[in-house]
Amino acid sequence: MKIKEIGFVGIPVTDMAKARAFYENILGLKPDPEMTGEKWTEYPIGTGVVAIANVGGDWRPSDQGTAAALEVESLEGAIARLNEHNIRYDQVESPVCRMAIIQDPDGNKLIVHKLKPENKKGSDV
């Protein structure tokens, strides 16, 4: 098997209206009008997609395990926006990036992420 790219990251939610308000109004994501419905909404980001879904069954929100890392233009700007909306976060710095770890209204972990300039893909370092 040869995996070419990530098709989408799926995030389970329990309340689509509340989740959409968070992903659109706080994170600033724009929904794809052709992929928006009562139980599924997709947000194109670069060449990828973040999808939120309320499909029930065994696919439930969790703060354990996988977290999507969303690269931002400015971590300082993102943190200001999180503060403006009273979103709690843990700020972490690694050798390659800076990030704020947050949770959506269902408790799913998300990472607001900014690579340090010397670690950008395609750099000579």
Which residues does each predicted region cover?
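Vicinal oxygen chelate
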Residues: M16, A68-K109
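Conserved beta-strand edge residues that scaffold enzyme active sites
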Residues: G37-E38, P95-V96, K121
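Short, charged/polar, Gly/Pro-enriched secondary-structure boundary elements
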Residues: G48-A51, R60, D106-L110
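Active-site beta-strand termini and strand-to-loop segments that position acidic
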Residues: Y43-G48, I102-P105, L115
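Core segments of cupin and vicinal oxygen chelate
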Residues: G10-V50
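Acetyl-CoA-dependent GNAT
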Residues: A53-G57, E93, K114-E118
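Short secondary-structure boundary/capping segments
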Residues: M1, D32-P33, T41-E42, G57-P61, ...
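N-terminal beta-strand motif that seeds the catalytic metal site of vicinal oxygen chelate
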Residues: M1-K18, T47, T66-A68, K116-V125
